[in-house]
Amino acid sequence: MKALWHTLWQGQDIAVCRDSVEVDRFNAQQIERVLLLHRGTGDSPGDVVQVVIELTDHCLVFSADTGIAGRINFERQSYWAERGCVHWVNIARAPLPLRLRTGHGLLRLSPPPFARVARADVAGMIAKWPVQGAQTWDERKRLRIERAQPLSFEHA
């Protein structure tokens, strides 16, 4: 039977659980940057495939199935807006070490739902990613709506 991974807020910490047993925990104040890796344009919450959270010495890599994207996009929104640390990257332009990569089509890779890796091991790769943001989900949605609006002219 497949293990059930999930994340949840506990005070100022985010706990990572496997089958309801806590396996990791980190304080949200330690987060330096959140990278939401998405397919397509990233305009839908379902486009987020993986999340990389950069701490001082480690990177935490989550699959979307853990619910971490929901913790970032829809819970404590004012906290994330104030922090200005949420960024977006198209997954096609965001290579990770093979064991952490997700895939589709003929290349169906199955990365672990959660991994804590030394930041030094992935920093060189992440530095080359074309990062967008900082912007929360609400800011991203608002920009998408504005881009879809026909040009409007104000009359003096």
Q: Which residues does each PLM region occupy?
A:
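Eukaryotic intrinsically disordered, low-complexity regulatory linkers and tails enriched in Ser/Thr/Pro
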Residues: 1-156
